[in-house]
Amino acid sequence: MKITTSKRFINCLILTTFCTVLFSSATVDETENYLSTKTVIKTIVIDAGHGGGDGSTHGAFSKEKDVALQVALKLGKAIEKNLTDVRVVYTRTTDVFVQLYDRVGIANREKADLFISIHCNSMPLVSQRYVVKGKAYYRKVPNPTTRGTETFVAGFNRLKEQDVAIRENASILLEKNYKDNYDGFDPSDPESYIIFSLMKNAFRDQSIKLASLVQDEYVNTGRVNRGVKEQGLAVLQKAGMPAILTEIGFISNAIEEKYINSDEGQAEIVNNILQAIINYKKDVES
């Protein structure tokens, strides 16, 4: 067993080295081309995570797919109102399932200048002890303590840090011919992420810049900052523009679930992301 694992790891390392060399020059060329030809933010694609039969995670009274759609639609309207020179495109406007490769495909076909995917975070269920007539029982309940926001860009993540990537990429399994769509990538195999992460996004630096601006805005309104992180996320990996996935809060946390479902909370989140876009747009167009 150890020998097999070692061989697989060595093969991954060899392929890692090859892919790094293969993609690095193309990445530099694509980035330079973007910076030299796209100096104006004209089109932004807003992606509401999950949808339809893919509800993903849920809280005590709400589902991620519904909250993500509400925030995505409000964000799109806010962009159209405040940035009249920007065209907004949605990957979905109703409760339907859109395949991950179709989401980024929409952005690429529309020649988008930014891709922003809206999601809710969640922690695994934990055991809770309760007593009935002197007898102890245990039940699984949402983790009530973890909270905050984090924003992801496409990139490499260590094996032990793949929880978010595995959860978000699980949507792939709902797609027909998913192995063909993602070049054999298996979202349930941790070793697949080593290679998948090497499909270097040409717009890493720009994506990190936008993600950092989003996190800064969250912090300005008192949110807990969990930082900007790189993950092998299928919805971002093949984007032909700066792309981020922002987790607007933990739906598994009772306080944050109420916040991200409230009109006030959603308005604040939308304003955070909008202001980050405005700041990013001002910077790249100057």
Regions found by a protein language model. Name each.
Residues 1-286:
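Catalytic-site microenvironment of enzymes
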